[in-house]
Amino acid sequence: MLYTVSHSPYHCDLSALLRLATSEDDILLLQDGVIAALKESEILKLLLNNPASLFVLEDDVIARGLVGQISDNATLISYTHFVDLTLRHQQQLAW
């Protein structure tokens, strides 16, 4: 399953997502969801303790002026890689 998080982590229930995600899943932070990948944030720690892989859309990081503030533990990806993730996962859930 591909979980896409496009809302600020302060305006959505990420704890519910984390209860569902498994090691076979990917989580993609995009739009305002990229805030969840800020270095040293408590939300980031929760995401990194989850077995799912964590990706962050680089264009949205740049658009929000957050370059250099995103954790190195989150993988920055391009729109091309985003498309690859959608092809890899038959099921997707927007969060």
Swiss-Prot record:
Heterohexamer, formed by a dimer of trimers. The hexameric TusBCD complex contains 2 copies each of TusB, TusC and TusD. The TusBCD complex interacts with TusE. This is Protein TusB. GO terms for cellular component: sulfurtransferase complex. Part of a sulfur-relay system required for 2-thiolation of 5-methylaminomethyl-2-thiouridine (mnm(5)s(2)U) at tRNA wobble positions. It holds the Pfam family DsrH. One of its GO terms (biological process) is tRNA wobble position uridine thiolation. It comes from the Bacteria. It comes from Yersinia pseudotuberculosis serotype O:3 (strain YPIII). Keywords: Cytoplasm, tRNA processing. Belongs to the DsrH/TusB family. InterPro entries: DsrEFH-like, Sulphur_relay_TusB, Sulphur_relay_TusB/DsrH. It is found in: Cytoplasm.
